[in-house]
From Swiss-Prot:
InterPro entries in alphabetical order: LPXTG_anchor (IPR019931), M_anchor (IPR019950), SMDRR (IPR049895), YSIRK_signal_dom (IPR005877)
Keyword match Secreted: yes
UniProt region (Disordered), positions on chain: 308-362
Residues that bear Pentaglycyl murein peptidoglycan amidated threonine: 357
Role summary: Binds IgG molecules of the Ig1, Ig2 and Ig4 subclasses, and also binds fibrinogen.
Compositional bias segments (type: Polar residues): 334-362
Gene Ontology CC: one annotated term: extracellular region
Name of the protein described by the UniProt record: Fibrinogen- and Ig-binding protein
D repeats by residue range: 288-293, 294-299, 302-307, 309-314
Source species: Streptococcus pyogenes
PROSITE patterns: GRAM_POS_ANCHORING, SMDRR
Pfam families tied to this protein: Gram_pos_anchor (PF00746)
Comp. bias intervals (Basic and acidic residues): 322-332
Length: 388
């Protein structure tokens, strides 16, 4: 996510910090120059030169522009900080929404896959049990047929044995000469008895197999019933999971739509932030321009102070030279001295006459600037009058 450029914020703090010192300088310049419009010297009023008045107006204009830029910079800084917080909150919200949607979807898919695997395993196991049951059913049917056959064979052997025994008894009663035939019949009867015993044993074994197969079949049928119940429950759970998955997908689409909306808002906020940062950069450029203008005004003021000092020095040296021209002996010099003195008088009282700025008159720059400009105005007016 986008982060606020620390250089931009540093520039904003620097702009706010530098504003205070420059604003003080401009206040000094504007106030000092504005109050040089009229200078009283006893009963006369000296009008400041147009250049001084123009500089005062320019200083006031620069000061007002500076105040407007200060407010604009503060507003831009507050807006940028607010938008940076909004961008961070929206970024976190988008990430949380996406993470929540992915988690729900993943959980639903995992549960659905697990249930599908469980249903598949139960279906395979049920099929195997049914095959085993069919095998036992076939075994039971075969054993039943064999038992029936053995029972028929046993019944036939019993009938034959009974017939042989009856025939033997009849021969015994008829004649002793039929001893051999009786022995033969007795041998056949013994064979039939052996066959009958073998058939009974086989019949017992077949019955045991039949009972085992029947019990196993019942057991498998019970397992099949249990598996079918589990399968039905798993299918119902699968239906519920599918519904949950559909709901999760719908929620995911909803969250994705919300995320898309938030991303659009985020892009719009980023664009607005970029515009504000561009305005802040323009404000910084305007600040540099105003600082340059303030510096130029300070340099002009210093130059005027130098000119004033030079004029005062020239005036002082001119006043000390004696007038050697004969025709000029009666030129009055006292008015000049009076004017000079009257010019000095306001300079001495300037500190008391300066407008109140909310502070005591202890600012050396303010005192020097105001005195210099006022003195410059008076001396220049005096010089212009003497030249005329």
């Amino acid at each position: 996510m986008s982060k606020t450029n620390p250089n931009k914020l540093y520039s904003l703090r620097k702009l706010k910090t530098g504003t205070a010192s420059v604003a003080v300088d401009l206040t000094v310049l504007g106030t000092g120059l504005a109050n040089t419009t009229d200078v009283k010297a006893e009963s006369r009023r000296y009008q400041a030169p147009p250049r001084v008045l123009l500089q005062g107006k320019e200083a006031n204009k620069v000061f007002e522009e500076r105040k407007a830029l200060e407010k604009q910079a503060r507003d831009l800084g507050d807006t940028i900080n607010h938008m940076s917080q909004t961008i961070s909150e929206q970024s976190r919200k988008i990430a949380a929404l996406k993470s929540e949607a992915e988690l729900k979807n993943q959980q639903a898919l995992e549960a659905l896959n697990n249930k599908n695997k469980q249903i598949s395993d139960l279906t395979n196991e049920n099929a195997q049990l049914k095959e085993a049951i069919e095998g036992y059913v076939q075994t039971i049917q075969n054993a039943s047929r064999e038992i029936a056959a053995k029972q028929q064979e046993l019944a036939a052997a019993k009938s034959q044995l009974e017939a042989k025994n009856a025939e033997i008894e009849a021969l015994k009663q008829q004649d002793a000469s039929k001893t051999e035939e009786i022995a033969k019949l007795q041998s056949e009867a013994a064979t039939l008895e052996n066959l009958l015993g073998s058939a009974k044993r086989e019949l017992t074994e077949l019955q045991a197999k039949l009972d085992t197969a029947t019990a196993e079949k019942a057991k498998l049928e019970s397992q099949v019933t249990t598996l079918e119940n589990l399968l039905g429950s798993a299918k119902r759970e699968l239906t519920d999971l599918q519904a949950k998955l559909d709901a999760a997908n719908a929620e995911k689409e909803k969250l994705q739509s919300q995320a898309a909306t938030l991303e659009k808002q985020l892009e719009a906020t980023k664009k607005e932030l970029a515009d504000l940062q561009a305005k802040l950069a323009a404000t910084n450029q305007e600040k540099e321009k105003l600082e340059a203008e303030a510096k130029a005004l300070k340099e002009q003021l210093a130059k005027q102070a130098e000119e004033l000092a030079k004029l005062k020095a020239d005036k002082a040296s001119g006043a000390q030279k004696p007038d050697t021209k004969p025709g000029n002996k009666e030129v009055p010099t006292r008015p000049s001295q009076t004017r000079t003195n009257t010019n000095k008088a306001p300079m001495a009282q300037t500190k008391r006459q300066l407008p109140s700025t909310g502070e005591e008159t202890t600012n050396p720059f303010f005192t020097a600037a105001a005195l210099t400009v006022i003195a410059s105005a008076g001396v220049l007016a005096l010089k212009r009058k003497e030249e005329n």
